[in-house]
Amino acid sequence: GCNYHDLADYAAIQINDTHPSMVIPELIRLLGERGIEFEEAVEIVTRTCAYTNHTILAEALEKWPRAYLDAVVPQLMPIIEKLDALARTRTKDESLAIIDKDDRVHMAHMDIHFTHSTNGVAALHTEILKNSELHGFYELYPEKFNNKTNGITFRRWLLECDPRLTATLEQHIGSGFRKDAAELEKLLAFADDETVLNELTAVKKTNKAALAEWLLRTQKVAVNPDAMFDIQSKRLHEYKRQQLNLLYLIHQYHEIKAGHLPAVPLVSIFGAKAAPAYTIAKDIIHALLTLSKVIAADSEVSRWLQVVFVENYNVTAAEKLIPACDLSEQISLASKEASGTGNMKFMLNGALTLGTMDGANVEISQQVGEENIYIFGQ
């Protein structure tokens, strides 16, 4: 038979953000059905579960009215109430309670109290959690807090995404990087090799031509493949600052109209979706589409500047955009981006990064050197 007392030795349950938090009371309930007392069930669940905080935005730290949970999961509310009572024996700080004075159930609070690990997803993000957003919990459980910087799979975002670049790399450094990303450092030996640099430039040019063809076929937009491809692809949110990019493009439009021409033509590409009820995000999309139409109708400007908004942006579209990118926009409001992974995907495919000192940009700049990333702001 099964020995549920040793569950943590055989299973690990990862709670990514607060959306799966109900696994805690539900697992306690299931263990109770199998004859395990509440106190031991809590201890088993705490050792089995770990919590990752992916963002400090309040919208992702779910708080549910007790009345909702009473109606939807009545079998779990008594367990949540017992967990709240247990948490209150550990601290008198009301702000760390699971059920607050307004009868709202804080999922993140339940996660931190009753898991064995709480981690952020970039070094800066974890420090913000410890020193600001979750400081009270850090003082209570310093041993639980740790950092695990986000990452990407090179199989998807280099080998599958950019086969031309992969083949070129293999010609010069072998295939070891397919299994060990550190092998890519061998490429540094060719930093001043004009032949290799020309080959890499040719790969980028071919990828840009392929993206131009895809945009014409799927978006019915013709772009200049010889222009600089400036890409910002991520979910539409105020803190990610697509609106800052928009204001820059409006400025560029007026500069061109005034006769101040850029050094090279620019194609600015946006890939994003807005949450269904996020009105401001939808307004930003509307503004981008309007600007795109204004520029397209002005032959004086459109020779130098184009704005493209990719509809129904998804991973398939990302696999087209990322290998063709010249300039990667990672311009979130500093302290608000927990990590980001687009910054990694674009740089892996040879794009230059323009960004703020935020999220994983901090660690990327340390890895590649400040001279190889364009950081602005505080």
Regions flagged by a language model, labelled:
Residues 64-119, 123, 127:
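Polar, glycine-rich mid-to-C-terminal structural blocks
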Residues 18-24, 49-59, 125-128, 154-157, ...:
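Flexible loop/turn segments at secondary-structure boundaries
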Residues 2-8, 31-43, 55, 59, ...:
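Secondary-structure transition/capping motifs at alpha-helix termini
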Residues 32-78, 340-378:
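Catalytic or ion-translocation cores adjacent to nucleophile or general acid/base/metal-coordination motifs
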Residues 136-187, 323-324, 331-378:
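Catalytic binding pocket for nucleotide-activated donors in carbohydrate/polymer assembly enzymes
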Residues 49, 56, 205-318:
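Long, K/E/R/D-enriched contiguous segments that form extended
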Residues 4-15, 24-32, 62, 66, ...:
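Glycine- and acidic
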Residues 161-229:
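Extended, charge-enriched "interface" segments that sit outside catalytic cores
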